[in-house]
Amino acid sequence: LSDNTALVMTSPRSPFSVAVVPHPHPGPDQVVVRARAVAVNPFDRLIQTAGDIMTPFLRYPAVVGIDVAGEVTAIGADVTRFQLGDRVVGFAAGTDKTRNQAGEGAFQTFVVLLEHMTSPIPPSLSFEDAAVLPLGLATAASALFQSDYLALHAPSARAEARGQTLLVWGGSTSVGTNAVQLAVAAGYDVIATASPHNFALMRTLGATAVFDYRDPGVVHDVVSALRGRTAAGAIAIGPGSASPCIDILGASQGNRFVAMATPAASFDQVRAGRGHRRSLVPAIVRMAAGSVSLALRARRNKVVAKMIWGSTLVSNAVGPMIFQDFLPSALAQGRYAAAPRAEIVGTGLAAIPTALERQRRGVSATKLVVRV
């Protein structure tokens, strides 16, 4: 009998169930990790509620989940960076189109991770705190460093000042806290938006100026703050974030490119289960209308706006640049914070659906973590 259990979806839109699954074995460039903590993301919930549309390629039964931290229990033949027992955090790529393997989903006891998407963690960093990192970090890095997005310089321990300013709209989110830190580590100034109670967090992470995204005059204020500066572009995170970013860059000098981390319409009100499929239709209509509206707005402002897919760096040089070259030393030397704050909401795989539902209702500057 296998000693591996997983939170499984047996078909598109099916409920989650805990089941015994085969114990995974690593490929040549992979490690197996005994999961100790996982974090939940909106994308995990989206696969369950709208996966037959958003991830039609996914094979079932499926194991979702991306954020995982734990201990290495097996090593592939070509792996050189890890040893048995190493404490690591990694990006579980099982739901990426190029991987599409249940054994590589995070929501199970033993998880297969790609070596180049895995980082060692220092003794001072708990599994629970480390687990907040992978998807937020990967999505931010995809936006900032991929050549077909903002194409910023790589982060390093001693980055030279670039003389450019990045706008991070939604700075206290999982993606935002990582975008702020990565941009600063790459030598860029950062202007962020957040709720006032998160202003101190933004400054701690390195933002040079912070604005309240709910303030009616925020677009004017950010444009004024960018006057005399060269914009490095913007990353838009959260519902309604792309429009103000487009307007701001359209009135500023520099790179008029908005990397969008959030779709044009929310799927939060769509529930899992085939009986709820009709609730998808209004969300799809809103997304189509919102996408057209954003495209027209971007064209008027001579701005490029493009959605980020957070797992694309699995297949290009940005993945190892972040998880292999940058993150290990940045964490070990205290130059990079595991952000946002981890909130432990349960223990065991069966606690994950409750965590996903709580996340749907909204969190602020927090990532929900489940101990495994």
Annotate each predicted stretch with a short phrase.
Residues S2-G27, R34-I75, T80-V372:
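Terminal helix/beta-alpha structural elements that buttress the NAD(P)+-binding lobe
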